[in-house]
Design a protein with these regions (language model features):
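N-terminal targeting leaders characterized by basic, low-complexity, disordered sequences
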Residues: 1-6
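Solvent-exposed, non-transmembrane regions of membrane-associated and secreted proteins
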Residues: 9-16, 22-215
């Protein structure tokens, strides 16, 4: 009888350990595909996320001064016809390789990856900061591979010192992140480049990365 009790205890322990590892395995499987599941269940959340991304990111009564100091402005890089045509942003740390849309329609721009916020700077006209926005979680039609490649889902994994490259009209512009922040508004307008996305599905908090050009 005592042997059966000991056996039962060991059996219960093994069952508990089995359930523990099964739970860990399920979590590991679900995490990468959770955005896909969420947007399948709640397709309207994509609209809410888009609204938060394009919502005014400059706090009221803040005026952004143009960068007028010519001595610190870097030259436009040389034309390189071996580079891809069009406009792209690459973030090697998180393997992002996203097209940049210059569409006036933010909804259309965000569907294709990164959208450059209008009325701010561009690589060729950097008097104001370049502001690039993208979905964090994207659309239910996106595969996990596509989400990781063109969205800013993994932007929180980037930090100071990480590099960003913009390809713009067959010219290569390199930047380095110097500041990471979670906030409702942009707080540093001295940056050459600002990346941002939403933190959570319904959160007003955004994830910002501020970078300076290096080439």
């Amino acid at each position: 009888m005592e042997k059966q009790t000991i056996f039962q205890k060991f059996n219960n322990i093994y069952v508990a350990i089995g359930f523990f590892f099964l739970t860990i395995a399920l979590i590991a499987i679900i995490i990468p595909i959770w955005p896909y599941i969420w947007y399948r269940i709640n397709p309207k959340e994509t609209i809410k996320e888009t609204e938060k991304i394009i919502k005014e990111i400059v706090p009221p009564k803040v005026e952004i001064e143009e960068k007028k100091t010519e001595s610190v402005r870097l030259d436009i890089p040389p034309l390189n016809t071996s580079l891809p045509e069009g406009k792209f942003v690459k973030i090697p740390k998180i393997e992002v390789n996203s097209p940049i849309s210059t569409s006036k329609n933010s909804d259309e721009g965000l569907k294709n990856g990164t959208w450059i916020v209008k009325e701010y700077g561009t690589p060729e006209q950097p008097d104001l900061p370049i502001i690039l926005a993208a979905h964090r979680f994207g659309y239910s039609s996106w595969s996990t591979e596509k989400r990781n490649r063109i969205s800013y889902y993994n932007l929180p994994k980037t930090g100071e010192g990480d590099e960003i490259t913009i390809y713009w009209n067959q010219r290569e512009y390199k930047y380095k992140i110097y500041k990471s922040e979670e906030s409702t508004y942009i707080t540093d307008y001295s940056a050459d480049l600002i990346l941002y996305t939403c933190k959570f599905f319904n959160s007003p908090i955004r994830i910002f990365r501020y970078a300076q050009r290096t080439n």
